[in-house]
Design a protein with these regions (language model features):
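P-loop NTPase switch/coupling surface
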Residues: 1-174
Length: 174
């Protein structure tokens, strides 16, 4: 399939993301290349966390598109610090605010917004400034715009699969 680029009105590319207090990430700034980007690292270093944070951050853009559910920060995604109380126990302290700042290029202009949850008890995450929602609404409703795509495959799916039951070898008589 050949795409006639002259029909494209507006496209968006993620240039940079700044992640604060998301899962195991205290602070992380990532700059993205103009085309394909690949995160490589050992197990457990946060590759998937970066992508999950981006999906929440891009939810600020998606919030402008009607009838599309957006992903918010969950309690499990807020970074936790364990504080020793001195008697062999500990307290969990949730590090808020949790935020993702997205910096994108949109028609040769830089556009930035922050998706943030200010406290553990906040019911939703906020998007500031809200102008990104208006831009998304315009892009979704007018033909010729290329909406952003982010795709990742979490290994969490591997652990959630139902295991096949096997025969108990100790159930028979010896």
């Amino acid at each position: 399939m050949i795409i006639d680029r002259s029909d494209i009105l507006m496209q968006m590319k993620i240039k940079k993301a700044i992640i604060e207090n998301f899962k195991g990430i205290e602070h992380c700034e990532i700059e993205f290349g103009p085309d394909f980007n690949l995160l490589i690292g050992d197990n457990g270093v946060g590759k998937t966390s970066v992508l999950e944070a981006l999906s929440v951050g891009l939810g600020g853009f998606i919030a402008g598109i009607g009838d599309v559910k957006t992903k918010h920060f969950t309690k499990d995604e807020i970074r936790i610090i364990l504080e020793n109380t001195g008697d062999g126990s500990y307290n969990r302290r949730y590090m808020t605010p949790v935020s993702v700042k997205c910096c994108v290029e949109l028609e040769d202009q830089s556009v930035e917004w922050v998706r943030r949850k200010n406290s553990l008890t906040s019911s939703r995450s906020t998007v500031e400034p809200r102008t990104i929602c208006k831009i998304a609404e315009k892009m979704a409703n007018e033909p010729g715009h290329i909406l952003p795509i982010i795709s990742y495959q979490s290994t969490a799916r591997m652990w959630m699969q139902k295991k096949e039951s096997s025969e108990n070898i100790f159930s028979g008589k010896f």
